[in-house]
Design a protein with these regions (language model features):
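N-terminal/domain-start segments enriched in small and hydrophobic, helix-friendly residues
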Residues: 33, 38-41, 65-70
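Extracytoplasmic/periplasmic helical hairpin
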Residues: 63-117
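Short, hydrophobic beta-strand elements of compact beta-sandwich sensory domains
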Residues: 55, 152-169
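Non-catalytic regulatory/interaction regions at protein termini and inter-domain linkers
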Residues: 1-11
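Juxtamembrane membrane-water interface segments immediately C-terminal to a transmembrane helix
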Residues: 37-61, 74
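Membrane-proximal, non-catalytic sensory/regulatory domains of signal-transducing membrane proteins
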Residues: 88-98, 111, 119-160
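Extreme N-terminal signal-anchor transmembrane helix of membrane signaling/transducer proteins, especially
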Residues: 10-39
Protein backbone atom coordinates (compact mmCIF):
# COMPACT_ATOMS: atom_id res chain seq x y z
CA UNK A 1 0.00 0.00 0.00
CA UNK A 2 2.83 2.40 0.73
CA UNK A 3 4.15 1.81 -2.74
CA UNK A 4 0.97 3.23 -4.26
CA UNK A 5 1.07 6.22 -1.92
CA UNK A 6 4.65 7.10 -2.99
CA UNK A 7 3.77 6.82 -6.69
CA UNK A 8 0.75 9.02 -6.16
CA UNK A 9 2.91 11.68 -4.44
CA UNK A 10 5.46 11.52 -7.25
CA UNK A 11 2.70 11.88 -9.84
CA UNK A 12 1.20 14.83 -7.97
CA UNK A 13 4.59 16.55 -7.70
CA UNK A 14 5.29 16.01 -11.42
CA UNK A 15 1.88 17.42 -12.28
CA UNK A 16 2.54 20.51 -10.16
CA UNK A 17 5.92 21.06 -11.80
CA UNK A 18 4.40 20.73 -15.27
CA UNK A 19 1.64 23.21 -14.35
CA UNK A 20 4.16 25.72 -12.97
CA UNK A 21 6.32 25.42 -16.10
CA UNK A 22 3.26 25.82 -18.36
CA UNK A 23 2.10 28.86 -16.38
CA UNK A 24 5.58 30.39 -16.59
CA UNK A 25 5.67 29.84 -20.37
CA UNK A 26 2.21 31.39 -20.79
CA UNK A 27 3.08 34.43 -18.64
CA UNK A 28 6.38 34.84 -20.48
CA UNK A 29 4.63 34.71 -23.86
CA UNK A 30 1.98 37.22 -22.78
CA UNK A 31 4.66 39.69 -21.64
CA UNK A 32 6.66 39.13 -24.83
CA UNK A 33 3.61 39.80 -26.99
CA UNK A 34 2.80 42.95 -25.01
CA UNK A 35 6.32 44.33 -25.50
CA UNK A 36 6.40 43.42 -29.19
CA UNK A 37 3.00 45.04 -29.81
CA UNK A 38 4.00 48.18 -27.93
CA UNK A 39 7.18 48.43 -29.98
CA UNK A 40 5.33 47.74 -33.23
CA UNK A 41 2.75 50.43 -32.48
CA UNK A 42 5.53 52.91 -31.83
CA UNK A 43 7.29 51.97 -35.08
CA UNK A 44 4.06 52.23 -37.08
CA UNK A 45 3.27 55.63 -35.55
CA UNK A 46 6.79 56.84 -36.33
CA UNK A 47 6.57 55.56 -39.91
CA UNK A 48 3.20 57.24 -40.49
CA UNK A 49 4.51 60.55 -39.11
CA UNK A 50 7.55 60.37 -41.40
CA UNK A 51 5.29 59.62 -44.37
CA UNK A 52 3.02 62.53 -43.46
CA UNK A 53 5.96 64.94 -43.25
CA UNK A 54 7.27 63.72 -46.61
CA UNK A 55 3.82 64.29 -48.11
CA UNK A 56 3.57 67.80 -46.64
CA UNK A 57 7.02 68.73 -47.95
CA UNK A 58 6.25 67.26 -51.39
CA UNK A 59 2.92 69.11 -51.53
CA UNK A 60 4.72 72.31 -50.53
CA UNK A 61 7.18 71.84 -53.41
CA UNK A 62 4.38 71.08 -55.90
CA UNK A 63 2.51 74.26 -55.01
CA UNK A 64 5.68 76.40 -54.85
CA UNK A 65 6.82 75.12 -58.27
CA UNK A 66 3.39 75.71 -59.83
CA UNK A 67 3.24 79.27 -58.47
CA UNK A 68 6.79 79.94 -59.67
CA UNK A 69 6.11 78.48 -63.12
CA UNK A 70 2.90 80.49 -63.49
CA UNK A 71 4.52 83.56 -61.87
CA UNK A 72 1.62 83.89 -59.40
CA UNK A 73 1.40 84.41 -55.64
CA UNK A 74 -1.67 82.18 -55.40
CA UNK A 75 -3.43 79.63 -57.56
CA UNK A 76 -7.10 79.01 -58.28
CA UNK A 77 -9.03 76.36 -56.38
CA UNK A 78 -8.97 74.16 -59.48
CA UNK A 79 -5.18 74.48 -59.77
CA UNK A 80 -4.72 73.58 -56.10
CA UNK A 81 -7.16 70.68 -56.50
CA UNK A 82 -5.25 69.41 -59.54
CA UNK A 83 -2.05 69.35 -57.48
CA UNK A 84 -3.38 68.18 -54.10
CA UNK A 85 -6.66 66.25 -54.43
CA UNK A 86 -5.03 62.82 -54.71
CA UNK A 87 -2.44 63.33 -51.98
CA UNK A 88 -3.40 60.77 -49.33
CA UNK A 89 -1.74 58.22 -47.10
CA UNK A 90 -2.22 54.82 -48.69
CA UNK A 91 -4.90 52.80 -46.87
CA UNK A 92 -5.79 55.73 -44.59
CA UNK A 93 -9.11 56.97 -45.96
CA UNK A 94 -9.28 59.86 -43.49
CA UNK A 95 -6.08 61.46 -44.81
CA UNK A 96 -6.07 64.57 -47.00
CA UNK A 97 -4.14 67.76 -47.68
CA UNK A 98 -5.34 71.32 -47.25
CA UNK A 99 -3.80 74.73 -47.69
CA UNK A 100 -4.25 77.80 -45.50
CA UNK A 101 -2.96 81.32 -46.09
CA UNK A 102 -1.02 83.24 -43.45
CA UNK A 103 -4.24 84.89 -42.23
CA UNK A 104 -5.83 81.51 -41.48
CA UNK A 105 -8.20 81.40 -44.45
CA UNK A 106 -8.61 78.11 -46.31
CA UNK A 107 -7.21 78.31 -49.84
CA UNK A 108 -7.75 74.64 -50.64
CA UNK A 109 -9.64 71.85 -48.90
CA UNK A 110 -11.15 68.67 -50.40
CA UNK A 111 -14.50 69.93 -49.08
CA UNK A 112 -14.77 72.98 -51.35
CA UNK A 113 -17.31 74.72 -49.09
CA UNK A 114 -14.53 75.23 -46.51
CA UNK A 115 -12.49 77.35 -48.93
CA UNK A 116 -12.59 81.02 -47.94
CA UNK A 117 -13.53 80.08 -44.36
CA UNK A 118 -11.26 80.45 -41.32
CA UNK A 119 -9.32 77.34 -40.37
CA UNK A 120 -10.70 75.50 -37.32
CA UNK A 121 -7.67 73.37 -36.44
CA UNK A 122 -6.13 74.67 -33.20
CA UNK A 123 -2.64 73.69 -34.32
CA UNK A 124 -2.94 75.72 -37.52
CA UNK A 125 -4.57 78.69 -35.77
CA UNK A 126 -1.57 78.65 -33.44
CA UNK A 127 0.76 78.68 -36.44
CA UNK A 128 -1.16 81.60 -37.94
CA UNK A 129 -0.72 83.57 -34.70
CA UNK A 130 3.00 82.81 -34.68
CA UNK A 131 3.33 83.98 -38.30
CA UNK A 132 1.39 87.16 -37.51
CA UNK A 133 3.82 87.81 -34.63
CA UNK A 134 6.75 87.62 -37.03
CA UNK A 135 7.84 84.14 -35.95
CA UNK A 136 8.58 81.42 -38.47
CA UNK A 137 7.85 78.02 -36.86
CA UNK A 138 9.57 74.95 -38.25
CA UNK A 139 7.81 72.16 -40.10
CA UNK A 140 6.50 69.45 -37.80
CA UNK A 141 4.12 66.56 -37.21
CA UNK A 142 1.73 66.95 -34.29
CA UNK A 143 -1.25 65.15 -32.81
CA UNK A 144 -4.33 66.98 -31.59
CA UNK A 145 -8.01 66.61 -30.79
CA UNK A 146 -10.59 67.90 -33.29
CA UNK A 147 -14.20 67.73 -32.11
CA UNK A 148 -13.42 64.65 -30.00
CA UNK A 149 -11.43 62.83 -32.69
CA UNK A 150 -7.71 62.20 -32.30
CA UNK A 151 -5.89 63.48 -35.38
CA UNK A 152 -2.38 63.84 -36.72
CA UNK A 153 -1.19 66.76 -38.81
CA UNK A 154 2.05 67.37 -40.66
CA UNK A 155 2.58 70.95 -41.76
CA UNK A 156 5.02 72.97 -43.82
CA UNK A 157 5.29 76.73 -43.91
CA UNK A 158 5.75 77.83 -47.51
CA UNK A 159 8.02 80.69 -48.60
CA UNK A 160 4.97 83.01 -48.84
CA UNK A 161 3.83 81.87 -45.34
CA UNK A 162 0.94 79.77 -46.65
CA UNK A 163 0.63 76.55 -44.66
CA UNK A 164 0.36 73.10 -46.25
CA UNK A 165 -1.26 70.60 -43.88
CA UNK A 166 -1.55 66.82 -44.24
CA UNK A 167 -4.24 65.57 -41.88
CA UNK A 168 -5.27 62.06 -40.81
CA UNK A 169 -7.31 60.40 -38.06
Amino acid sequence: MRKHSGEKKRGTLATKIILVVCAAVIVSNVFSIMFVLRGAQSQIRSSVKTTMMDMAESSDMLVENAMSTLNQDQLTYDAYAFLLKDVKIKNVDSSYVYLVNEDGTMLYHPTEEKVGQPVENVVVTGLVKQLQNGEHPGNAVVDYDFHGTAKYAAYCIMSNNDIVVVSAD
